[in-house]
Design a protein with these regions (language model features):
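Juxtamembrane regions of bacterial inner-membrane/periplasmic proteins
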Residues: 1-216
Length: 216
């Protein structure tokens, strides 16, 4: 029928357009792909420059997610081994095995499926990310794109949404709370699981003390 033909033509046209975009995308440099991914996730109004983000927000994130961030490359083999041991002893997820760089590329480019193929892609992209960007730049990208729950993406939305303040005015306690959330934003929702969120916040602060980032 005519309608059937129209549908087929539409599908073919869409597939042709998609294939053209795929070809164009493959021709882009890695940095151009990163810029596109950031553009899709962060507006100019919500992007927070590195020098505006409190040092305690950066320290809190590193303390709980990737304590050797400035000492290792894109992949932290020692960190993965340590995380497995620490989590087993604690009986809970105290440390993650993925580096901040790995988490960033996963958020920007990959699905949430935990497969060997995806982990391999994550590792390759993380290595490429650290080839083109500094640790400080990667940390800034992470803090501007990570999901904090309640449809808050990035530290600006989270600071305003949870605390009614700007990122630059976040207190140490608020920085620790925000660093606690990306691990499990739905479960650690401060509105529905305040006790769990506070416990994770306390853990962040303890990690910061243990690593000499703050005094007790």
């Amino acid at each position: 029928s005519k309608a059937h033909t129209t549908v087929e033509q539409t599908i073919e046209k869409n597939e042709d357009t998609l294939s053209r975009w795929e070809r164009i995308y493959r021709m882009l440099t890695f940095k151009e792909k990163v810029e596109i991914a950031l553009y899709q996730r962060v507006s100019k109004d919500t992007w927070v420059k590195s020098d505006v983000i409190p040092d305690n927000a950066k320290r809190a994130l590193i303390a709980i997610e990737d304590k050797r961030y400035y000492k290792h490359g894109a992949i932290d083999v020692l960190g993965v081994s340590r995380a497995l041991y620490v989590n087993a002893v604690a009986g809970e997820t105290v440390e993650g095995g993925s580096t901040i760089t790995q988490q960033l590329v996963k958020n920007l480019f990959l699905s949430s499926k935990r497969t060997m193929t995806r982990k391999a892609e994550e590792a390759i992209l993380a290595i490429e990310m650290e080839h083109y960007y500094s640790k400080d730049e990667i940390l800034t990208m992470y803090l501007n794109t990570v999901y904090y729950g309640h449809n808050f993406y990035g530290i600006k939305e989270a600071a305003e949404g949870y605390f009614g303040t700007s990122p630059s005015r976040l207190t140490l306690g608020q920085c620790a709370m925000l660093a606690a959330l990306p691990n499990a934003p739905s479960y650690l929702d401060p509105y529905t699981n305040y006790k769990g969120a506070k416990a994770r916040q306390k853990l962040v602060l303890e990690q910061m003390v243990d690593q000499g980032m703050i005094t007790q």
